Amino acid sequence: MQISIITVGKLKEKYLREGIDEYSKRLSAYCKLQVIEVNDEKAPEEMSAAEMEQVKRKEGERILAQIKQDQYVIALAIDGQMWSSEKLSAEMDKLALHGRSQVAFVIGGSLGLADQVLKRADALLSFSKMTFPHQLVRLVLLEQVYRAFRISRGEPYHK
């Protein structure tokens, strides 16, 4: 399976980079992983609703340019479905069974995802009703994808 993580902005925090590097290494035994960082749009501290939509739209265009036509897209969105780790594993198994070997997970910037990205998504996933920094979500996502592969193969993993 080929997994792409398409995310807005560059990761600067060393502690997050170390965690992401660790899970990327672990995942290499299960899939081909690609992390694609698209540039975030520069935005002032105080923005109108129209300016916020414009920022999301520009970031969305950059995201959509990275999505391949045949990829199954799972967008992380606050109003997405909340899945257990077992459900994520089952969904990934189902995709593989149906020949959908290319999966893209999309993480928006600090303002979230543009409507055009949400419309392109095949599924919307939420980790919580809480809001997390999008950089931290990268690490959590990689850990959950790793956990999903371990569950799928019946390998031990902390519950």
UniProtKB/Swiss-Prot annotation:
Q: What does this protein do?
A: Specifically methylates the pseudouridine at position 1915 (m3Psi1915) in 23S rRNA.
Q: Establish whether keyword Transcription regulation is in the entry.
A: no
Keywords linked to the UniProt accession: Cytoplasm, Methyltransferase, rRNA processing, S-adenosyl-L-methionine, Transferase
Q: Which is one Gene Ontology cellular component term of this protein?
A: cytoplasm
Provide the catalytic activity annotation: pseudouridine(1915) in 23S rRNA + S-adenosyl-L-methionine = N(3)-methylpseudouridine(1915) in 23S rRNA + S-adenosyl-L-homocysteine + H(+)
Give binding positions for S-adenosyl-L-methionine: 76, 108, 127-132
Provide the primary localization: cytoplasm
The record lists the lineage as: Bacteria, Bacillati, Bacillota, Bacilli, Bacillales
Assembly and interaction partners: Homodimer.
EC number of the protein = 2.1.1.177
- InterPro entries in the record, alphabetically? Alpha/beta_knot_MTases (IPR029028), RlmH-like (IPR003742), tRNA_m1G_MTases_N (IPR029026)
Name under which the protein is recorded? Ribosomal RNA large subunit methyltransferase H
Any Pfam family the entry gives: SPOUT_MTase
| Source superkingdom | Bacteria
Disulfide bridge positions per record: none
The compartments listed are: Cytoplasm
Q: For this protein, what is any one GO molecular function term? A: rRNA (pseudouridine-N3-)-methyltransferase activity
Q: Which SUPFAM superfamilies does this one have?
A: alpha/beta knot
What protein family is recorded? Answer: Belongs to the RNA methyltransferase RlmH family.
UniProt xrefs under PANTHER family: METHYLTRANSFERASE, RIBOSOMAL RNA LARGE SUBUNIT METHYLTRANSFERASE H
Q: Which organism is it from?
A: Brevibacillus brevis (strain 47 / JCM 6285 / NBRC 100599)
